[in-house]
Amino acid sequence: MDSGSVAAERPRRTPSRQRLPSSGCGVPARPGVSTLPGGRSWLRPRGRAARASPLLFLLLVPSPRLAATATATAPRRTLAERSRPGLVLPAAALGAGRNALGRLRLGARRVAALASSRRELSLSAKCHQLEHRKENLPLSVSRQLYFDTHALVCLLEANGFTIQQAEIIVSALVKITETNMNIIYKDMVSKMQQEIALQQVLSKIANVKKDMVILEKSEFSALRAENEKIKLELHQLKQQVMDEVTKVRTDTKLNFNLEKSRVKELYSLNEKKMLELRTEIVSLHAQQDRALTQTDRKIETEVAGLKTMLEAHKLDTIKYLAGSVFTCLTVALGFYRLWI
């Protein structure tokens, strides 16, 4: 129940209704509750303080001792004096009104905390309701009164309120309690309904257990047999795979050993061939060295023979040249003597 719904349900004020003076209570306004001016506007709920108003009654109504002392000390005013506009309230009435307002504001603070805790409780209770709601409650439950309205009206009149103001306040409190109790009945369940829901849940659990036993006897046995068959097949396949793997391993080992022996034989043959080739190469190198030494010796002998022949031819040519030169000189001298 929010402030909008309360404002919509509030009856309209007649023009003849008088307001209390603004200085009647002498208390500054607070954000949760407005002051006395405006008649019943000080009971206008704001925010979360409108929901948990059942505690508001206990905080609003003063104790019997305070009420007795207030009524004993304050003189009783007549109806004509109450209906006069602009009449100042007596000091006892003002004190009682201030006490009621102080209790109301203190209750507003407590109500905010209680509203938040009640909201958390309702949210946690919704998970365990199991779809049992309170729509089928009798109307007498939601329409019954939870406090003495006549005594509260009399108490408000004794504290300085008019009859109309007291009736409006009591009607607003009755509506607030009805809406809060309806919200509580919608959010919560009774102990009997909780026991019924618990019995239903237990019966459903028993049915599920029976179904599980039946499934274990019928379907689970078949599933177990199928699982055993599958396990046997898997074991056989595993054995076959292991046999194949061992065969492949032995074949590969044999092939590897054969190839290894063949490679070793080829390596030995290649080594032998390499040794033979090396011996042949060494022999060829020796033959080449021998042939080279023989040719070198032959060349040296030929060169020495040619040198000796050249020396001999040199001497012969020198002899012939010397003889030819002397002959020419002798002929020239002979001709020279002849001419002279």
From Swiss-Prot:
Modified residues (N6-acetyllysine): 204
Coiled-coil region: 197-291
Transmembrane segments annotated in the record for this chain: 55-74, 317-339
Superkingdom field: Eukaryota
Disruption phenotype: Conditional knockout mice lacking Mcur1 in cardiomyocytes and endothelial cells are viable and are born at the expected Mendelian. They however show impaired mitochondrial calcium uptake and mitochondrial calcium uniporter (MCU) current.
GO biological process: calcium import into the mitochondrion; calcium ion import; calcium ion transmembrane transport; cell migration; cell population proliferation; establishment of localization in cell; generation of precursor metabolites and energy; mitochondrial calcium ion transmembrane transport
Gene3D superfamilies: 1.20.5.340
Pfam hit, one: CCDC90-like
An annotated Gene Ontology molecular function: protein-macromolecule adaptor activity
Keywords carried by this UniProt record: Acetylation, Calcium, Calcium transport, Coiled coil, Ion transport, Membrane, Mitochondrion, Mitochondrion inner membrane, Transmembrane, Transmembrane helix, Transport
Topology versus the membrane: Multi-pass membrane protein
Renumbered residue ranges of the record's region Disordered: 1-44
Places the protein is found: Mitochondrion inner membrane
Secretion signal, residue range per the UniProt entry: none
Gene Ontology CC: one annotated term: mitochondrial inner membrane
Topological domains, Mitochondrial matrix: 75-316
Principal subcellular localisation of the protein: mitochondrion
Subunit organization: Interacts (via coiled coil regions) with MCU; the interaction is direct. Interacts with SMDT1/EMRE; the interaction is direct. Interacts with PPIF.
The protein's role, per its UniProt record: Key regulator of mitochondrial calcium uniporter (MCU) required for calcium entry into mitochondrion. Plays a direct role in uniporter-mediated calcium uptake via a direct interaction with MCU. Probably involved in the assembly of the membrane components of the uniporter complex (uniplex).
Family in the record: Belongs to the CCDC90 family.
Name of protein: Mitochondrial calcium uniporter regulator 1
Source organism of this protein record: Mus musculus
